[in-house]
Design a protein with these regions (language model features):
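Positively charged, small/polar-rich N-terminal and surface patches that mediate targeting and assembly
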Residues: 2-105
Length: 105
C-alpha cells in the first residue's frame, strides 16, 4: 500500500465525561454528537459518593484538537447543573477532574 492510498488524522485531546443516566442525559448525548464529529459511549454501573446501590452511567469519550482544560471545566459544570448533580467527573488527557458544587459552612 502506498502513502497516497490512505490518510491519517491525529487528535491531540481526549475528553471522557462520566454522565449519570438521569433525566436529560440523552439530550446531552445528542448535543455532544452534534458538536463533535466522533465520540464513543460505554455504559457501566457506578458506585460513587459513598452509595452502595449502583447508578447507571455513560462514559462519553471525545477526541478533538480544539479544546483546552478550562473550556472543558466550564462545559462539565454546565453539564452538572443541567443534570441537577452535586458533582460530575471527567478526564482530560488522562487527568481525572471532579467538578462539584461548593459546600457552604
Amino acid at each position: 500500500m502506498t502513502q497516497g492510498e490512505y490518510s491519517v488524522q491525529t487528535f491531540r485531546d481526549s475528553v471522557k465525561f462520566y454522565v449519570p443516566r438521569v433525566e436529560g442525559y440523552l439530550e446531552t448525548v445528542r448535543e455532544m454528537a452534534a458538536k463533535y464529529s466522533g465520540m464513543s459511549m460505554i455504559e457501566f454501573d457506578g458506585y460513587f459518593e459513598g452509595r452502595f446501590e449502583p447508578v447507571k452511567y455513560t462514559r462519553i469519550e471525545i477526541h478533538t484538537n480544539d479544546v483546552d482544560e478550562a473550556q472543558m471545566m466550564e462545559a462539565a459544570n454546565r453539564l452538572r447543573l443541567s443534570l441537577k448533580q452535586e458533582s460530575l467527573a471527567f478526564e482530560f488527557n488522562n487527568k481525572l477532574i471532579l467538578i462539584a458544587e461548593k459546600k457552604s459552612h
